[in-house]
Swiss-Prot record:
Motif PDZ-binding domain per UniProt: ranges: 149-151
Leftover remarks: Belongs to the high risk human alphapapillomavirus family. The cancer-causing human papillomavirus E6 protein has a unique carboxy terminal PDZ domain containing substrate.
Protein known as: Protein E6
SUPFAM superfamilies: E6 C-terminal domain-like (SSF161229)
Matching InterPro entries: E6, E6_sf
Protein encoded by which gene: E6
Gene Ontology biological-process entries: DNA-templated transcription; regulation of DNA-templated transcription; symbiont-mediated perturbation of host apoptosis; symbiont-mediated perturbation of host ubiquitin-like protein modification; symbiont-mediated suppression of host cytoplasmic pattern recognition receptor signaling pathway via inhibition of IRF3 activity; symbiont-mediated suppression of host type I interferon-mediated signaling pathway
Annotated function: Plays a major role in the induction and maintenance of cellular transformation. Acts mainly as an oncoprotein by stimulating the destruction of many host cell key regulatory proteins. E6 associates with host UBE3A/E6-AP ubiquitin-protein ligase, and inactivates tumor suppressors TP53 and TP73 by targeting them to the 26S proteasome for degradation. In turn, DNA damage and chromosomal instabilities increase and lead to cell proliferation and cancer development.
Similarity comment text for this entry: Belongs to the papillomaviridae E6 protein family.
Amino acid sequence: MFQDPRERPRTIHELCEALNTPLQSLQVQCVYCKKTLEWADVYNFAICDLRIVYRNDSAYGACKKCIIFYSKIIEYRRYTSSVYGATLEARPKRSLCNLLIRCHRCQIPLGPEEKQRIVDEKRRFHEIAGYWKGLCTNCWRPRREATETQV
């Protein structure tokens, strides 16, 4: 499909432009399970702003099930450390808003509100495979004591 690695599209949107195909009708396989991505998986891959990988000059994405599954495996294998928000801001001397932090479960980039929520709730950011991770609003679970009911 794309012989020269420098000309290869890196995102789903760039691939759609290169193939002159709308996002709804794009046919891409999952790099892990090799199934053709359904439209919801294509949209999820685009929203997560993940990069396309190439195998034998063919473009591959990842379905949501595989993203969640392999994110957990990477978390177990490549976890480095956990820090609070103030410590993370002091390390690279940049504000949290300027750092790319993804959800460690679904890989969506966190917005400023989600990063601030982690700081306010006194939760930690995790360094996994050299990247900083947190939890997005969709994957957030309240702490156990917040969900317990009194009798």
